[in-house]
Amino acid sequence: MRILLVEDTEDLAEGVIAHFARGGVVCDLAPSVEAARDARAVQVYDAVILDINLPDGSGLALLRDMRGAGDRTPVLMLTALASVDDRVTALDQGADDYLGKPFDQRELEARLHALVRREAGR
């Protein structure tokens, strides 16, 4: 499995990447919306883990662009914005799941695997 992690907090990103690597998951890092667009232009991903607040824009804008282009890649929002309104907004705009920070790596992994299994069953 290959995933794209769109996250600008370096220590958090390193922890997620290390956790997934132990399970054999390849995790590419994009620290900005622009870097995520560039990565997606040259690589197909099984899933995207997406922060909302990024240095060059909103992860929600990237999500809207993906869904507007018909991209059905599973997207799990991983963000400190964890109010009910934040979760509902992201889910309404096409996110497949939402996990607030702080989080447990095991839950992130379980949710991600569930999304990929669900997409594979379509």
Name each model feature, range by range.
Residues 1-122:
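N-terminal/domain-start alpha-helical segments
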